[in-house]
Amino acid sequence: LGIAREAAATFRKPFVPPVVKETGNDEKVAEYVEVKIKDADLCSRYVARVVKNVKIGPSPLWMQRRLSACGIRPINNIVDITNYVMEEFAQPMHAFDLDLIAGNKIIVERANDGDEFVTLDGQVRKLDSSMLMICDAEKPVAIAGIMGGENSKITDDVKTLLLEAACFDGTNIRLSSKKLGLRTDASSKFEKGLDPNTAMAAINRACQLIEQ
């Protein structure tokens, strides 16, 4: 989509984003998880989707090849789909194991000074109150826009996913990433500033790929 936007600007043509149909049933996400944004100045949009009866396995060969061409190592179908959609829409996504989300709540709020958090790479990160976190009813589960936590990571035993697509403040992500010494594919995209409207299309695309 980034190339399409640049081409539209270069040739002075209107950019027409792809239309991705919403998949799933009539159940509401709110029946499974409550999302609360406490620091709206740092998170202009947060879209969540619940995916049940998940089976972890390898992603299709065509997807693995495309990810490899982008310099991304294929891992499994769920991680690969979130990475693929990130490259396709320039919209980072994250997947949580919903069964590990305490109280069925997602709270977007700043960290407390001196808090420590173990990220997916197994490193202990020292936080401060300028950093935005994704929390459940009891604990932080991700550093917003940068990296998820070990305490809610996807394993082969996952049954129900909580997918996240959000729009976090680019300046805050850049400063937090620098303080933590942790720059990721996701943070590098957020740093540039994202269109909040892309989140819904991206999460619909991810669900479409999961259903396939």
Which sequence ranges carry the predicted segments?
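RNA/tRNA-interacting regions in translation and RNA-turnover enzymes
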Residues: 1-212
